[in-house]
């Protein structure tokens, strides 16, 4: 069999415009200036093996890109061999087991459309453009994580190419250390994933939502209502609270948004009934039991978070027992107004008694995130500072259990991304499988970008 020619651009001899187009394939236009030594867009596993050999020959770091949606832009590392998996694509469903096998560059939208034809579902990312690679390796806070669990919990096996160029299958029974790390080690995973094998769920055919928006001065009233009603809500309802400023909202507002997956319209309406019957008065917008779909929700999110804007975000898990209303009051009610938008986000996580045996090891009942969306690069320092300062202040008060590794800022706000035992094990696995630190080192080492 003839192996297709390696699709590669070398920094020093590629047409500058073509090299920059390949380099800058990121959702976030606030990206590092780091210039990879070469960029490879593999279409075969042999191409990926060749990339590892080139990294060794050139004594270079390896960097990976799946969907390019990482707001941290970790795929850009100075003088690295960047393996962009955009064209390395595969989707297959096993009818007998309900397991779907996918490559890292397959997006949430693509996976769910594919599974819908099989009447199956997977708790993918909240954005349709999110590639599964980074999403799963970082744990996967996906659709209705409160009830459906973290996406990495659905992983049954993973296929990888090691930094030494070996092809491995990893499962609880084979290369179990790599399988353990694949569920939550994030950018410290010391191999290149070529395929994820994922359990799926039955597809509930009906999706409806409720959305209510109030002025931010109603913050306490809204949060109290949500916390009181939360224990009574169906597991098939995903409730969230947003605080935001957008160009068409000159004052900060607070929004409650919930969608439900159900067997029928009647069932969905009944499940949402407690929300539209009890929500606080004074809402500027009231939308009860509106027909929707996951794809429609993806499109709505796309309008708020367009590709090519500048983004800065940070996300945390609050310490158990924290007074959520007091802890988050300032971040939800004093968002800075700007040209594109500021978003504060809260989603409840269900505290299961025990997580599966995996690297993902820090979570609590409350997940909170801040995001700045803007266009002017001269605003970078300002936008970064208000978000980091907010969480640094909360950390000084003992309110933060840990930080979501997918939004980590290891230089500007180092924090806990795993439990101490999990962190130690991730480091040991990294040294074993990537002794020269070609791939690992984004979190644990400095000067890697």
From Swiss-Prot:
Biological pathway: Secondary metabolite biosynthesis
What keywords are assigned to this protein? FAD, Flavoprotein, Oxidoreductase
Q: Which domain of life is it from?
A: Eukaryota
A single Gene Ontology molecular function, please? oxidoreductase activity
What Enzyme Commission number(s) appear in the record? 1.1.1.-
Instruction: Kindly list any coiled-coil regions of this protein.
Output: none
SUPFAM superfamilies this protein is in? FAD-binding/transporter-associated domain-like (SSF56176)
UniProt-listed InterPro entries: FAD-bd_PCMH (IPR016166), FAD-bd_PCMH-like_sf (IPR036318), FAD-bd_PCMH_sub1 (IPR016167), FAD-bd_PCMH_sub2 (IPR016169), FAD-linked_Oxidoreductase (IPR050416), Oxid_FAD_bind_N (IPR006094)
Gene3D superfamilies given in the database record: 3.30.465.10, 3.40.462.20, Uridine Diphospho-n-acetylenolpyruvylglucosamine Reductase, domain 2
Give cofactor(s), names only.
FAD
Q: Which residues form the FAD-binding PCMH-type domain?
A: 32-203
Described by its record, this protein's role is as follows: FAD-linked oxidoreductase; part of the gene cluster that mediates the biosynthesis of the indole diterpenes janthitremanes such as shearinine K or shearinine A. The geranylgeranyl diphosphate (GGPP) synthase janG catalyzes the first step in janthitremane biosynthesis via conversion of farnesyl pyrophosphate and isopentyl pyrophosphate into geranylgeranyl pyrophosphate (GGPP). Condensation of indole-3-glycerol phosphate with GGPP by the prenyl transferase janC then forms 3-geranylgeranylindole (3-GGI).
Of which family is this protein a member? Belongs to the oxygen-dependent FAD-linked oxidoreductase family.
According to UniProt, the name of this protein is: FAD-linked oxidoreductase janO
From which source organism is this entry?
Answer: Penicillium janthinellum (Penicillium vitale)
Taxonomic lineage from the root:
Eukaryota, Fungi, Dikarya, Ascomycota, Pezizomycotina
Q: Which gene encodes it?
A: janO
């Amino acid at each position: 069999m003839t192996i297709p020619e390696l699709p590669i651009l070398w920094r020093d001899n590629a047409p500058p415009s073509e090299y920059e187009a390949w380099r800058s394939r990121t959702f976030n236009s606030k990206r590092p200036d780091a210039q990879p030594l070469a960029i490879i867009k593999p279409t075969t596993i042999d191409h990926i093996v060749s990339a590892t050999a080139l990294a060794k020959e050139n004594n270079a770091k390896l960097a990976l890109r799946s969907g390019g949606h990482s707001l941290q832009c970790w795929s850009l590392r100075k003088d690295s061999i960047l393996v962009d998996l955009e064209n390395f694509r595969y989707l297959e469903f096993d009818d007998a087991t309900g397991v779907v096998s996918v490559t890292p560059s397959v997006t949430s939208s693509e996976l769910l459309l594919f599974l819908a034809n099989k009447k199956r579902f997977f708790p993918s990312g909240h954005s349709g453009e999110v590639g599964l690679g980074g999403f799963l390796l970082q744990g996967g806070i996906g659709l209705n994580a409160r009830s459906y669990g973290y996406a990495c919990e659905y992983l049954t096996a993973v296929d990888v190419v090691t930094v030494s160029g070996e092809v491995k299958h990893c499962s609880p029974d084979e290369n179990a250390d790599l399988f353990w790390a694949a569920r939550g080690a994030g950018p410290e995973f010391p191999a290149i994933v070529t395929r994820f094998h994922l359990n799926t769920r039955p597809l509930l055919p009906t999706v409806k939502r409720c959305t209510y928006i109030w002025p931010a001065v109603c913050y306490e009233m809204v949060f109290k209502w949500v916390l009181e009603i939360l224990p009574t809500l169906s597991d098939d309802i995903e409730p969230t609270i947003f605080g935001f400023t957008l160009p068409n909202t000159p004052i900060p507002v607070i929004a409650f948004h919930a969608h439900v997956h159900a067997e029928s319209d009647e069932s969905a309406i009944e499940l949402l009934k407690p929300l539209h019957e009890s929500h606080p008065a004074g809402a500027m917008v009231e939308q009860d039991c509106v027909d929707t779909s996951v794809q429609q929700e993806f499109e709505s999110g796309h309008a708020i978070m367009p590709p090519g804007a500048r983004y800065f975000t940070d996300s945390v898990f609050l310490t158990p027992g924290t007074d959520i209303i007091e802890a988050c009051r300032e971040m939800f009610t004093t968002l800075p107004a700007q040209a594109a938008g500021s978003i504060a986000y809260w989603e409840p996580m269900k505290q299961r008694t025990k997580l599966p045996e995996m690297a993902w090891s820090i979570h609590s009942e409350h997940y909170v995130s801040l995001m700045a969306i803007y266009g002017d690069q001269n605003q970078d320092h300002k936008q970064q500072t208000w978000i980091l300062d907010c969480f640094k202040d909360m950390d000084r008060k003992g309110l933060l259990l840990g930080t979501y590794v997918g939004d980590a800022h290891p230089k500007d706000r180092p924090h806990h991304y795993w439990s101490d035992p999990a962190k130690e094990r991730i480091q040991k696995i990294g040294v074993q499988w990537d002794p020269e630190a070609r791939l690992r080192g984004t979190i644990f080492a400095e000067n890697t970008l």
